[in-house]
Curated annotation (Swiss-Prot):
One of its GO terms (biological process) is tRNA modification. The record marks 102, 125 as: Interaction with substrate tRNA. Its cofactor is Mg(2+). SUPFAM superfamilies: P-loop containing nucleoside triphosphate hydrolases. It is an enzyme of class 2 (transferase). ATP binds at residues 11-18. This is tRNA dimethylallyltransferase. The gene is miaA. Monomer. Catalyzes the transfer of a dimethylallyl group onto the adenine at position 37 in tRNAs that read codons beginning with uridine, leading to the formation of N6-(dimethylallyl)adenosine (i(6)A).
Amino acid sequence: MSKIPVIVIVGPTAVGKTSLSIELAKKLDGEIISGDSMQVYRGLDIGTAKITPEEMDGIKHYLIDVTNPSEPFTAAKFQIETRKCIETIHQAGRLPIIVGGTGLYIQSVFYDYDFGNVSEDKAYRAELEQLDKTVLWQMLEQKDPESAAQIHENNKRRVIRALEVMHLTGKPFSEYQVNNVLNDRYQPLFLGLDLDRALLYERINQRVNLMFEEGLVTEAKKLYEQHLVDVPAVRGIGYKELFPYFEGKSSLEEAKELIQKNSRHFAKRQLTWFRNRMDIDWIQAGVSSTESEALNKATTFLTAK
């Protein structure tokens, strides 16, 4: 059985992945799979910068709006569902294109991730259960920053599991999870979009301003009123920062500035993950040659396969 070619577009938030993916899909007869851990959730639209039907421009998209925020969508589930989507697109005679910024999820598709077969240490786990989730996440960040960049602070169960695996095996959870041999069913081309840090941060600030103009506060308030504030999906950047505002503990401007700050930090962690964990062909974003360079690399890859 021949390998399935897959184009993968990665990079930090607000760098321009979505628009590039649409252009490549048009020119290469592709369909797009979202590689974003947040865009799978219905109702989380503005805060996740979810692509709109207009922006899709007729290109079929997968793994967007497939579940409710109260229903966890894990990396293991993403691996299974994305592989199904790849097969569906390939069997239809089209090119699968994955686009997103969730490194752990995307990497799990192409490498045979082990999602935790190490045995448990119930005594150690019980000790960790007594600690505050912030303290636990800080422990993880100190011991294994790569895992901390991918596991949300509010996902206490996952943080504890990562610490438990390190306690039992003596090596970082991020190293334990991944098998560095590519799954032989796929032949991926990883294209990464990079941008000058100052320009990227300015884009992020502008994107957050636009989110507020488009109704982010209303979207977050709806989630708040549905008592979903402790659901991991809703604790993502863009929502959790507004909850103190709803409770009268911060101003709206403070909430906006915090979203911008957290988004910038997240972009930095994304870049660290992609540069350290994946073999990526980087392209300069935000210049006139971005699209043509990406298209040339993709065409060369597809011709040579």
